Amino acid sequence: VKNPEEKTTFNQQLEKWQDQVSSMDKRPGSFTTISGVPLKPLYTPLDLEKLDFEADLGLPGSYPYTRGVQDNMYRGRYWTMRQFSGFGDAFDSNRRYRYLLEQGQTGLSVAFDLPTIMGYDSDHERSLGEVGRCGVAIDSLEDMEVLFSRIPLDQVTTSMTINGPAAIIWCMYLANAQNQGVGLHQVGGTIQNDILKEYIAQKSWIFPPDPSMRLITDILAFAADHVPKWNTISISGYHIREAGSTAVQELAFTLADGFAYVEAGIAAGLNVDTFAPRLSFFFNAHLDFFEEICKYRAARRIWARHLKERYGAKDPRSLKLRFHTQTAGCSLTAQEPENNIVRTTLEALSAVLGGTQSLHTNSMDEVLALPTEKAVTIALRTQQIIAHESGVANTIDPLAGSYFVEALTNQMEEEAEAYFERIEKLGGVLKAIDCGFFQQEIADAAYLFQQAVDKQERIVVGVNRFNSDDKPQIELLKIDPAVEKKQVERLKKLREKRDNNAVSNALNDLRIAAKTNENLVPKILTAVKCYATGGEIVALLKEVFGEYREKPLF
């Protein structure tokens, strides 16, 4: 619509069309996104009158990075296909990793069992019945050596989903790389290391916020000096969404956490451009196709603007929001699990069209158990078909310029900014966590969504509509109970054969350092090289830092 006369004519045409449509029958159901954002029946140039191409879109690889963080995106290379995997002991998971790499996977992603996540060794009383169940059991450097046996760590990047004990697990990985003859400057990968979203959503915390943030800034500083290819935090919206948030809440709360980490790094005396380039993100890909695409585009623009204008970042790499995506586990159904293949495909496609840097596609059986080899192969093949057969990777940001996509991207950005203002008024992210703001927002959103499903206002195929009485006939992966016994026995033998004087000295040095402002990463690295266990290190740090206790919120 180029001039006032044309605009008047177009408005007249639009009004006539609206009158015609308003008298037509409508199919039942609400016309909103999954998150409840109302959708117009038609989007036109009038919805983008305030859009400034250069300021709001630009070109791929250029500020504000709405259209992607690389100049040539998938014309250069495909996203990293990184299937999240881990179960049993290190031997079991090593076999799965090597199988996935043989099948064409291009990166690794480690799932740890609950005892490892919570900082307990496999022989701890609280680990009983949980060893190797929901991920791989890692007690010491010895397990890490087995986990990556015959996998050269200078040739593959690894993402590790670990938070409370992230510094310890990371040091085990670095020590293992050095044992392979790989220099720290060559090691690439990611640790999740996002403790704020633990307080908000996943609840797998160990230490209180202040010492937890201290460990994170220690990692930022050590990596900047010694491990330059490592992504030090994967700021995670995935778990926030899985807990029941809307897409807008996932966007806003994740970026708010990111800003809090930037502020913590700066407060620790670090220049923003020394650590911000190695911050990465982890988003959910849910089923509302266009809402998810717009979420990713808005995230890149918001991050770039805030890092530049609010935090004074000058290195273009600091402004680029790079992210991993996982399809939505909460969208999968136990009923008719084969339907989950279709759900995962749609979600994966939205992540690709939204410009993800790496992707995990859930397996159809993950709602029932850890995935079988067959199921995980289908999930990987889903990515490969999208990459090599669909053609969607041949054009960079192909949905740019769509009136609907650009309008929804703008709307999500505006709603996220409104959340930032509310969080700021509460005193920042930590204060908002303490008063239960995030937790209440997520709980309310989850309740409203479930109500809509229960009332059939939201259709879930095979669950509340088009459902069958047939029970699924599907093979499930079962963890051998003997895994726990074997892991405990290996741990006992490790404690007998290691140099326990060296372990004691290393742990004592760590205890002394933890009571000062000294960077703890070198001390932890020394301890794990002596084969101190994760549980031993966590127990020591609990003595110094204490443990977190959440206030009653509901």
Predicted feature residues:
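Catalytic alpha/beta active-site cores
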Residues: V1-H286, E291-E292, R310, R317-H324, ...
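Flexible, glycine-rich loop/tail regions that form catalytic "lids" or insertion modules at the edges
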Residues: K2, Q18-K50, G58-T66, L114, ...
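Short acidic (Asp/Glu) and glycine-rich catalytic loops that position anionic groups and cofactors
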Residues: R77, D123-R126, L153, L196-Y199, ...
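Generic, well-ordered alpha-helical scaffold segments in large soluble proteins
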Residues: F87, R96-Q103, L141-I151, M172-N176, ...
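Conserved strand-to-helix beginnings and helix N-cap segments that scaffold or border functional pockets
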Residues: N94, W170-C171, V248, I293-R297, ...
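Short beta-alpha connecting loops at secondary-structure transitions
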Residues: G129-R133, E198-F207, I240-S245, F283-D288, ...
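Phosphate/diphosphate-binding loops
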Residues: D139, T157, I162-P165, A177, ...
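Flexible glycine/proline-rich, aromatic-decorated loop/lid segments
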Residues: N271-F275, A313-T327, Q335-M364, P371-I396, ...
